[in-house]
Each structure stands twice: as C-alpha cells, then as structure tokens.
Curated annotation (Swiss-Prot):
InterPro entries membership: Cyclotide (IPR005535), Cyclotide_sf (IPR036146)
An individual GO BP term: defense response
Keyword presence, Disulfide bond: yes
Protein name in UniProt: Cyclotide ltri-A
Post-translational modification, as annotated: This is a cyclic peptide.
Cross-link (Cyclopeptide (Gly-Asn)): 1-28
Disulfide-bonded cysteines: 4-18, 8-20, 13-25
Task performed by this protein: Probably participates in a plant defense mechanism.
Family in the record: Belongs to the cyclotide family. Bracelet subfamily.
Keyword terms of this UniProt record: Disulfide bond, Plant defense
Length: 28
C-alpha cells in the first residue's frame, strides 16, 4: 500500500520488492 516511486515505467520497482499497480510502484 505504500507508494515506492512515481511510475513503474521509470523506476526498478521489482528490485526493491515493490509491485506495479495502475502504473505506479507500491509496497504493502
């Protein structure tokens, strides 16, 4: 549920344990 970054397109979400939801990075 916590936003990890601005957009999953520009940031390596998966490498920091985040997932891409609605074009945004989230973690729990």
């Amino acid at each position: 549920g916590v936003a990890c970054g601005e957009s999953c397109v520009y940031l390596p979400c998966f490498t920091v344990g985040c997932t891409c939801t609605s074009s945004q990075c989230f973690k729990n």
